Amino acid sequence: MMKKKISAKKKNQQQQQLHQPTMSEVTEEERTRYEEEEDVRDSPSDSSEESEDDEEEIQKVREGFIVDDEEDEVQTKKRKSHKRKRDKERPHYDDALDDDDLELLLENSGLKRGSSSSGKFKRLKRKQIEDDEDEIESQDHQGEQQLRDIFSDDEEVEEEAAPRIMDEFDGFIEEDDFSDEDEQTRLERREQRKKKKQGPRIDTSNLSNVDRQSLSELFEVFGDGNEYDWALEAQELEDAGAIDKEEPASLDEVFEHSELKERMLTEEDNLIRIIDVPERYQMYRSALTYIDLDDEELELEKTWVANTLLKEKKAFLRDDWVEPFKQCVGQVVQFVSKENLEVPFIWNHRRDYLEYVDPDAPIPGSVRELMISEDDVWRIVKLDIEYHSLYEKRLNTEKIIDSLEIDDELVKDIKTLDSMVAIQDMHDYIQFTYSKEIRQREETQNRKHSKFALYERIRENVLYDAVKAYGITAKEFGENVQDQSSKGFEVPYRIHATDDPWESPDDMIERLIQDDEVIFRDEKTARDAVRRTFADEIFYNPKIRHEVRSTYKLYASISVAVTEKGRASIDAHSPFADIKYAINRSPADLIAKPDVLLRMLEAERLGLVVIKVETKDFANWFDCLFNCLKSDGFSDISEKWNQERQAVLRTAISRLCAVVALNTKEDLRRECERLIASKVRHGLLAKIEQAPFTPYGFDIGSKANVLALTFGKGDYDSAVVGVYIKHDGKVSRFFKSTENPSRNRETEDAFKGQLKQFFDEDETPDVVVVSGYNANTKRLHDVVYNFVSEYGISVKSEFDDGSSQLVKVIWGQDETARLYQNSERAKKEFPDKPTLVKYAISLGRYLQDPLLEYITLGDDILSLTFHEHQKLISNDLVKEVVESAFVDLVNAVGVDINESVRDSRLAQTLKYVGGLGPRKASGMLRNIAQKLGSVLTTRSQLIEYELTTRTIFINCSAALKISLNKSINVKDFEIEILDTTRIHPEDYQLAMKMAADALDMDEESELHEKGGVIKELLENDPSKLNLLNLNDFANQIYKLTHKLKFRSLQAIRLELIQGFAEIRSPFRILTNEDAFFILTGEKPQMLKNTVIPATITKVTKNHHDPYARIRGLKVVTPSLIQGTIDENAIPRDAEYVQGQVVQAVVLELYTDTFAAVLSLRREDISRAMKGGVVREYGKWDYKAEDEDIKREKAKENAKLAKTRNIQHPFYRNFNYKQAEEYLAPQNVGDYVIRPSSKGASYLTITWKVGNNLFQHLLVEERSRGRFKEYIVDGKTYEDLDQLAFQHIQVIAKNVTDMVRHPKFREGTLSVVHEWLESYTRANPKSSAYVFCYDHKSPGNFLLLFKVNVSAKVVTWHVKTEVGGYELRSSVYPNMLSLCNGFKQAVKMSSQQTKSYNTGYY
């Protein structure tokens, strides 16, 4: 590291470093103290050899901006050759920063000055060259001033913000350009450009910090580039300073706004880039003015946020922690609202302010409790937004009050209102009570309409006497309610008594309507108007509203009333089954299970239920309110007036309850959504908070060489593909084997041989990861696992000690791979690779960095599920919490900034660094590439080269790791070792102090003076830092600077010892349960005891004995789980055949073998289908449920009232729907006999044809003397058993034969039709035919065929009969004869067509 000279004065400042905080933290109060201390600091000392600097200059620097580095004193020849020659173009101003000032500023900010830059501070902004020399000088001088102002601590008034922002933008992000041309050459070329200029000019001055590549893409979209030569020429002219004074065209005038918005090139995007506020904060606050609060208002915000958060966390806090908790919350509010510090910076570098230090501990500072978690800091950020929204609403209301000069006791306490609804209530009260004054004021703005016009007319009319006659005003009633409510409505007296008039309400109304000026002559209309007016006054009274809201907050009861639609559609397996009869749920109940309310709201949206929000014991509460309004008189007139008052109060309270009920439901919805979102966030954190897979013998955080294997669906003809990814993320080799190991033993051995050859060709991978699309992948995993064991494939340790370990074969999490394989990103990265290879690439990348793999999904990540109830909240909310999780982890892990410049995948993490976002991150990368040659050598260059502004630098710098590519020549740069750690630049001086103390080094030593103490420590023994007493050191710092630094010191020590060590948890290897869920989509705990369809693959029985029982069945589920059904789980005398689909219940599940034990017994299936809804007493409406059950039974009984009960074991009193539900889990051919709606002499037999296919046969019952006969389809049977055996079972066998035939296809008619078309296109020279179900006539089939590829699909109907199959009036006994008959029929039809055509022509 190059050494640099430090003046004596700077040595003195290093000695006093603990007295002076970094400029990033200086407040107005501290600044005054530091200015006083500066006199002492600047006085001569033993080490001083230089004269005192200009105090005024230093003060200007300190207040003007913060700089972290300077250009070095010595430029290389290469840099000199490109250095701008503009000393002659502008004069040097007296107030410009000199070398000592800048160096002093850098040291005060905790940064170092590079030694290879020039001693003078060189501006990086390219100046516009105008013909007028005076204008050049003026602009140059303004630019110098802007450079100072850009990092200013002082906030200017709002009115000045806009023009200053643009000035800063011009001076901050403009691209530099170096030229060796002399002045004359430039002038000549400038004139030539002017002559060539054509068309209107586009203003691209604001594009200096905008993606030039994006602009280029825009031009490509709208043409080949020639059409817009004038725009590109305009940019060249502007860069040379040759654009004249014409009004430039904006980008919006040239391009579609949607295109600009997509590429973040709009004016709003530019403002976000340049404003010195974290981009995420800008987006959060975009809907607000976000007024800078004064000290008094800030204290109110701290109290409000602390109280709000305390309500959410009170159950987790001890009573003696409440006040420390509030203090910590207040400090975080200060960081967020005033200092614009982002969550990761607060969490990582202000941790001390989130803790409570026990003052009574035996050793001061030894007992610490974390009061605020990282989740809480995120919550405070959102509460800060809520408070500013509340504050702006209150401010607007106060403006109305001031403009109207209102003198009203109700509005004087507006500053104490701490909720949006309370402020809205006050706003509504003002709008109602002072509607006339507001309307008169707004008449000048042509806004004469008022919704309170009727109230104004009545208030000024004689009818208002009847309102006054109620004997008490709404305001007085509100005060009574407020007083009584505070005392629990238990005191007998009231503040305001109610007086009764001398006449009854009817008499008064009758008298008033006789007045000549009365507005309503009709008695009923007048009475209603009077009632409505007084009810409105009560309705808009803030104190009454407060009482109603408070009551609902404490005693709200939420119930569900099911609708007819919901009654019919919500069954035991519905997601709404557990809320169908939910009643009396308190807000606390719903917050404890937030998904319940959200599912209620979803069911309400679907029209299945109606949510009722009421208050408990409403009648008693209403009586308490009425006691505050009624009079105490006993006369008839008093009784009549009390009845009138009660009617008015009931109207007002009814309206208020409706409004408050909606507010309550909405408040609960937001809270429940927040809680679900928090669970989604933690679900994602659990997946990304893991380090890369650690190879054997390496430290955690090292990346492994990975071989990813898959064969997709795992069909017999599927090839196995593999991708070898090196530890640096580069795909180096590909593997492919057509020998599918799941086919047979021979192909398995061949596959192993090919895999062995692949391993022998190059370096052995550290880990093999296996995954796929379904459960067939289990076979591939087992084969690869056995292969590694059989051949002893091992990986050696990093150290040459002879130790080794078998290569691990693990399951792979493939949710990111499934999204990546078909993404546009995959097509761009690997355009010539098949989908399965792309899948394998992402599978391997996941092991090398799970966090990066999730981040690179972009918005596709919203399709993943991180919590079972994630779908109940909006995608916007999911996206917000996903972003917060990424921000936490990216800042904890850090980002290699130079690698991000080179690697577009890694660059996607930069937007999650504190202070940055997609706009600021892209601008930073672009500027590093343009200004620094794609290499950032020190963090201080972010400030020195104007790559970031002050606040953004504070937030982002510690998360940016500086590491240089070995291929880059850095001999001319001075590397700051601390830049390779997570230590924040503001703490660099503390780090050097700790290093010096650990080495017992004198602060006056040359090594410490030149910053080499860190290098000396790292080369010597970093563990010496463990001997330091950090608690005493932290106490010393606090006494000198009033800053808490204990946790920062701990972090510094850890970083100096380990240096950006991996802090994530070790990579989590998937268990069998995880793999089971990934490959089957079934959660083991939820699949057990559920009914699922299963296909029989093998029947075990004595096939030579026709009476033998089935001994067992082998089945496979739709998710390819292999199952067995034992003999005792099969119904007696049941017959099953291979290929048959049955409904079975899962009894046992084995995730290690992907196997299950199932049952076909009816009692097991019936028990599993009942569901498991928990019915809690008092919170479940048993009465309503019983009434609904009785109602349904009554409907069924009414339909079956006239039917006879048949004495037969298969007879059921079912309707068609119940029969189908009953038969759904049964076997094909099973049936029930049920009543017929046609009359008493008919029966209906419903039998199962297939899955969700049932045939309903109408059976006519006739009596022949003492005997009966049953007729169906024209055939007569002596009894029902004969009918079932000789008719239904025979037809069922024919159906089974058809379904098992190779030419049969499952699916709907459209699906089969599409398959037939595809088949003929693939085989254009062949004809084709296929059978499928006739869904419109279950039990019968359709025959679809095409004679050639160009012919249309022809459909014939096939009827299943006892004697076989009927096709076109011909009956065929079996499938073979049916197929042959069909072919003959087609051939004859074709010949007839030819004869007909010949005769015609």
Curated annotation (Swiss-Prot):
Biased composition (Basic residues): 1-12, 77-87
Compositional bias segments (type: Low complexity): 105-119
Domain of life of the native organism: Eukaryota
Pfam families per UniProt: HHH_7, HTH_44, SH2_2, SPT6_acidic, Tex_central_region, YqgF
Claim: Transcription is one of the keywords in the record: yes
GO CC annotations, alphabetized: euchromatin; pericentric heterochromatin; transcription elongation factor complex
UniProt keyword annotations, A-Z: Chromosome, Nucleus, SH2 domain, Transcription
Keyword ATP-binding: no
Residues annotated as domain SH2: 1209-1303
The name this protein goes by in its record: Transcription elongation factor SPT6
